């Protein structure tokens, strides 16, 4: 049984930890609001960018004139997975959730006989995936020193991916990130970047249903410029979604840690009081017994 001094030290230690987790929760809550606003503001832009690409792609009648970033290499053998996670931990299962989702995708592709390459964005994703797929990780990018994620960070990653594609290092590129839904809900998401998806987007409003568009100089040239920009935009959105998800998960994790610390303090305090009471009772019995002996 621990002594009163040990219990007192443990209570003081847990209280100190509780102060830290409470402060981290408040910091995460403050950052979450800004991160959530940024992520929600980026969604319409990235979605509309995809819609514009889809509309222009429909106007490209000559498949030979379309950019290779849209048409692809004609093969489906080498896959590059860009896995975006956080730089730091203490955010519950946020990082492991994305890594698990990517890991399942890797295993599926390998089972199909595909060649898989991994590009990690964020230290935690690299740390988790290298345990099983160290030989598959060909590129890593850390944003630890970045105080606030900006478009330039996403653009650097996008340009590097395009360089690798131009060098013939892969055929298909898929982006993995966590879409922010709420403080307690972040959904692992996979989005194909290359070849650029020309899937139909939501139907246009009735007032634009019969619109006829003219492209200058021509649709293929516009796509040549727009697709690389779209890749960076989609990566930027993924990074913003990740930041919001990380802050939400961290706030939830620190809230749980603070409450658990409170419960532990109550239990330790109860044990301390009971042991102290027993000790006082024992001392009183000894005093009374001594007095009676006299």
Swiss-Prot record:
An example Gene Ontology molecular-function term: ATP binding
Top-rank lineage group of the source organism: Bacteria
GO term, biological process aspect, one: proton motive force-driven plasma membrane ATP synthesis
Keyword NADP in record: no
Keywords from the named record: ATP synthesis, Cell inner membrane, Cell membrane, CF(1), Hydrogen ion transport, Ion transport, Membrane, Transport
Coiled coil regions, renumbered to chain: none
UniProt cross-references to CDD domains, sorted A to Z: F1-ATPase_gamma
Localization per Swiss-Prot or TrEMBL: Cell inner membrane
Main location: membrane
Any one Gene Ontology cellular component term annotated for this protein: plasma membrane
Membrane topology reported for the UniProt record: Peripheral membrane protein
PROSITE patterns: ATPASE_GAMMA
Assembly with partners or alone: F-type ATPases have 2 components, CF(1) - the catalytic core - and CF(0) - the membrane proton channel. CF(1) has five subunits: alpha(3), beta(3), gamma(1), delta(1), epsilon(1). CF(0) has three main subunits: a, b and c.
Function statement: Produces ATP from ADP in the presence of a proton gradient across the membrane. The gamma chain is believed to be important in regulating ATPase activity and the flow of protons through the CF(0) complex.
Family label: Belongs to the ATPase gamma chain family.
Protein name: ATP synthase gamma chain
Gene assigned in the entry: atpG
């Amino acid at each position: 049984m621990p002594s009163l001094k040990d219990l007192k030290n443990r209570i003081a230690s847990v209280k100190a930890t509780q102060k830290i987790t409470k402060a981290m929760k408040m910091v995460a809550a403050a950052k979450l609001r800004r991160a959530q606003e940024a992520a929600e503001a980026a969604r319409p832009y990235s979605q509309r960018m995809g819609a514009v690409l889809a509309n222009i792609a429909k106007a490209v009648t000559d498949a030979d004139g379309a950019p290779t970033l849209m048409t692809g290499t004609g093969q489906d053998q080498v896959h590059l997975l860009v896995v975006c996670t956080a730089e730091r931990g203490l955010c519950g299962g946020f990082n492991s959730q994305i890594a698990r989702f990517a890991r399942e995708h890797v295993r599926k592709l390998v089972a199909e006989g595909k060649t898989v390459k991994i590009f990690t964005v964020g230290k935690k994703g690299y740390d988790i995936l290298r345990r099983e797929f160290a030989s598959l990780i060909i590129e890593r990018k850390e944003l630890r020193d970045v105080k606030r994620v900006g478009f330039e960070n996403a653009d650097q990653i996008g340009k590097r991916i395009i360089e690798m594609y131009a060098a013939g290092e892969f055929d298909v590129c898929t982006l993995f990130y966590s879409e922010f839904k709420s403080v307690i809900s972040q959904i692992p998401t996979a989005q194909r970047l290359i070849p650029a998806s020309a899937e139909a987007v939501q139907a246009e409003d009735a007032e634009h249903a019969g619109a006829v568009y003219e492209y200058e100089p021509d649709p293929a040239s516009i796509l040549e410029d727009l697709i690389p920009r779209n890749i960076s935009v989609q990566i930027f959105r993924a990074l913003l979604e990740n930041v919001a998800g990380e802050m939400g998960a961290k706030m939830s994790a620190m809230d749980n840690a603070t409450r658990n610390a409170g419960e532990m303090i109550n239990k330790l305090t109860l044990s301390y009081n009971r042991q102290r009471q027993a000790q006082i009772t024992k001392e009183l019995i000894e005093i009374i017994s001594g007095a009676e002996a006299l």
